[in-house]
């Protein structure tokens, strides 16, 4: 099993992230925060600098933890977002990433998601078309507030856009009231990799195996079907950049467990996964 992480949760600097991955014996990075800047906004020169550091450390950039698709489907400019996606593709090529994580657009609060399905699918197909021939897989993550927040709508996405792979995030399903075993049964044929994040029914994030995510059972089945890549996404402490990941007005529920630093919280998340495996 190859284990990667959102190491920006340990340290905002690339050097600090490399140190955190190295001391925990990880294979590499799902890159998101780069010296305080989101990976989708760094220059190509900066991407080359990061690639050189990762290569020197013997680490791989497995996936781009991009914010693509995390815009309001009604209010925000999709063409500008497509430009950001094309730039993110160029960054991914330089970093040698095999995947780009993306989302299926925020649905206006209080509105039914169903009427937005056709537009969600159209936009996701635009991303697929732009990435064709690059050798980079586009991977949809289930997330609170987007079209693909619950399993049945994620299934629709993968049936309509078969080129998209799935990222299975147990904690995000719990925070949407979705049973994770039901979601896993529906979506496992589409899952390329998992985000290792667990939660309690009140939504608070806890170390892997300590919540209601059914991680031991799902991980066992994932391995049995040939799954061999995981990304640790701790969310056990407030870290630089957390606020930018949330929809305006939302807050992440962290802090059920208390850690003296982000580094300690990151190491705890790594150890929790190793205990399950």
Predicted regions and their residues:
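N-terminal-biased segments
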Residues: 1-15, 40-48, 80-85
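Histidine-acidic metal/acid-base catalytic patches
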Residues: 1-4, 11-25, 51, 151-165, ...
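Hydrophobic faces of well-ordered beta-strands that scaffold small-molecule active sites
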Residues: 2-7, 29-31, 61-66, 100-102, ...
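Active-site-proximal loop/turn and secondary-structure-junction residues that shape catalytic pockets
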Residues: 9-11, 33-35, 67-70, 104-108, ...
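Active-site acidic/histidine proton-transfer and metal-coordination neighborhood
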Residues: 15-19, 53-56, 73-166, 175-177, ...
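Glycine-rich, proline-tolerant flexible connector loops at the mouths of alpha/beta enzymes
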Residues: 30-54, 104-112
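The substrate-binding groove and active-site-proximal loops of carbohydrate-active enzymes
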Residues: 70-78, 205-209
């Amino acid at each position: 099993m190859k284990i990667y992480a959102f190491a920006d949760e340990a340290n905002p600097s690339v050097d600090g992230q490399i140190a955190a991955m190295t001391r925990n014996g990880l294979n590499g990075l799902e890159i998101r925060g780069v010296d305080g800047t989101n990976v989708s906004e760094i220059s190509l020169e900066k991407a080359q600098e990061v690639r050189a550091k990762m290569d020197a450390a013997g680490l791989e950039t497995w996936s781009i933890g991009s914010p693509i698709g995390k815009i309001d489907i009604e209010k925000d400019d999709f063409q500008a977002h497509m430009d950001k996606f094309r730039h993110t593709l160029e960054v991914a090529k330089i970093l040698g990433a095999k995947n780009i994580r993306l989302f299926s657009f925020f649905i206006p609060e209080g509105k039914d998601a169903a009427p937005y399905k056709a537009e969600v699918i159209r936009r996701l197909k635009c991303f697929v078309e732009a990435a064709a021939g690059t050798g980079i897989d586009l991977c949809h993550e289930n997330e609170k507030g987007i079209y693909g927040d619950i399993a049945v709508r994620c299934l629709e996405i993968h049936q309509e856009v078969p080129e998209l792979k799935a990222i299975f995030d147990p904690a995000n399903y719990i925070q949407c009231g979705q049973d994770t075993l039901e979601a896993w049964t529906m979506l496992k044929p589409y899952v390329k990799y998992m985000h290792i994040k667990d939660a309690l029914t009140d939504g608070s994030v806890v170390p892997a195996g300590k919540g209601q995510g059914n991680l031991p059972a799902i991980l066992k089945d994932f391995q049995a079907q040939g799954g061999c890549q995981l990304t640790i996404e701790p969310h056990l402490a407030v870290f630089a950049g957390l606020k930018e990941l949330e929809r305006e007005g939302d807050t992440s529920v962290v802090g059920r467990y208390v850690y003296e630093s982000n580094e300690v919280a990151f190491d705890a998340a790594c150890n929790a996964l190793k205990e399950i495996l």
